[in-house]
């Protein structure tokens, strides 16, 4: 329940309900914002993450009411120490992203993304595209 509350608060803060408050990760967490810049309605973002080539975990980010994720909205995934094996080398972190339509069908968003991750940092993935032309994901330049 504590993690769900943290995710909801982070989503609200990053989506503009923050009143100007900046999102920060504490020293035992890093955050990845998943920004929807797609040209169509998507309902969930599925992610799978790895250390090197080893699958570690995954999950879904979506609106609590099941509604479409609006263009420009940011959903946040927090990563804590317990999400990784002891001694995991976060410089070998990789994440794969998929969008999910209203019927539950998943669409890949390009290649697996690499990140030299570190606790205490906030990162953002920009998701673009549509069902006809395909989707892509890339790290934000900012």
Kindly give the residue locations of the regions a language model identified.
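Short acidic, flexible loop segments centered on an aromatic residue
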Residues: 37-55
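Positively charged n-region of N-terminal signal peptides that target proteins for export
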Residues: 1-4
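C-terminal motif of bacterial Sec signal peptides marking the signal peptidase cleavage site
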Residues: 13-16
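Bacterial signal peptide processing site
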Residues: 18-21
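Asparagine-centered strand-capping/turn motif at beta-strand->loop junctions
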Residues: 23, 32-39
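Tryptophan-paired
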Residues: 52-89
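A short, solvent-exposed beta-strand micro-motif common in secreted/extracellular proteins
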Residues: 88-102
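Structured interaction patches on ligand/partner-binding surfaces of diverse proteins
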Residues: 98-132
